[in-house]
Amino acid sequence: MQISQAGINLIKSFEGLQLKAYKAVPTEKHYTIGYGHYGSDVSPRQVITAKQAEDMLRDDVQAFVDGVNKALKVSVTQNQFDALVSFAYNVGLGAFRSSSLLEYLNEGRTALAAAEFPRWNKSGGKVYQGLVNRRAQEQALFNSGTPKNVSRGTSSSKVTPKYKVKSGDNLTKIAKKHNTTVATLLKLNPSIKDPNMIRVGQTINVTGSGGKTHKVKSGDTLSKIAVDNKTTVSRLMSLNPEITNPNHIKVGQTIRLS
């Protein structure tokens, strides 16, 4: 599963936004910017936009999304997942993995798991109102209803594969590695305005590599391809973001099926 915009908004509401680089403590090695993004990639006089700050936050949160996914052994709703990611992002993955909250949840005792949120209201043994407020909102989100559970491992919703940029990478090289195009990567990553401006450590959306494909033949339509391969048009369009109109595919075009 991936965190929703509602989950991102919850985290943003508690992290606070700074568009100029700063040091909370003068002796800190690196600068901080955006929603608490800290590291060697932040320069002393750097200034960013609110959109760039959210993109940085999403990159930072991704490790916690992955960590929560790995720790869960049961089905959860999107709201529950968002609350868990916010919680893990705040307390740390180690604390989340060893928590009674996760233990109860994986045992199927959801009500007991929800009751654990308010206990995590201290830092250094002292209760902080900010943590009380955050836990209350996470608990409320966790307990709020959604239309249906999202089954782990069998969900029909697509989780976009991720790739972390390494030293020496460029968008052309990444596209080739994942059997796709730079244009497709740019559509999957609207925050990338310049294909020559990606940074080491950045997490970008990619298409799955090595999956099943179909080369469009004369007489093919997206509906026919979907039926022949026991899938749906919407699923094919999500796998092929370069297809913006299901009625416009061309002979010889390669379409990803999985």
Swiss-Prot record:
Lineage: Viruses, Duplodnaviria, Heunggongvirae, Uroviricota, Caudoviricetes
Gene: 15
SMART domains assigned to the protein according to its UniProt record, in alphabetical order: LysM
Keywords of the record: Antimicrobial, Bacteriolytic enzyme, Cytolysis, Glycosidase, Host cell lysis by virus, Host cytoplasm, Hydrolase, Viral release from host cell
Family of this protein: Belongs to the glycosyl hydrolase 24 family.
Protein location: Host cytoplasm
Enzyme Commission code(s) on record: 3.2.1.17
UniProt keyword annotation of Hydrolase present: yes
GO molecular function, one term: lysozyme activity
Record's comment describing the protein's domains: LysM domains are thought to be involved in peptidoglycan binding.
GO cellular component: host cell cytoplasm
Catalytic activity: Hydrolysis of (1->4)-beta-linkages between N-acetylmuramic acid and N-acetyl-D-glucosamine residues in a peptidoglycan and between N-acetyl-D-glucosamine residues in chitodextrins
Active site as annotated: E15
The protein, known as: Endolysin
